[in-house]
Amino acid sequence: KKYMLTSGMSGYIPNRSGSAVSGSWEEPFVSLGNPHVNDDSRASFNSQISKVFRVEGTDQLIAMADRWVPDYPVDAHRADLFERAIAAHFEPEKYHVLPEEKRELMNSPMLQSANTSKALYVWLPIRWERDRPKIDWLDCWRPQLP
């Protein structure tokens, strides 16, 4: 099987991740949903997955994620606002963003204004639940050793 972990399209602002599986690279992928478990921020623990590593000599996978704008934490309200704003661009008759919400969006770190020199990384292990990748928040953990 081939697995894919994805991020939405909100520039440097974190968003909900997705996971998908396929029998091969040539077949369609089927969505498995958000791999982040109990993520109250709805923003992938305020990060965007950029790479998955296998710990050499083990079966353990580690997700490395960028936290581009650590000074701009995303909570469920902000996540909803960004999701609606992006959706409204493609389906304006279905999704709506109020003028005050647009102002809030315009005050967020944009591609031109985000200070990415402050970026951090989030490293979390991937566990498997019935052939689905799951990522839990852990304040502290150690990788498996061979």
Task: Show the residue positions of the predicted features.
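Carbohydrate-active catalytic/glycan-binding domains of CAZyme proteins
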Residues: 1-146
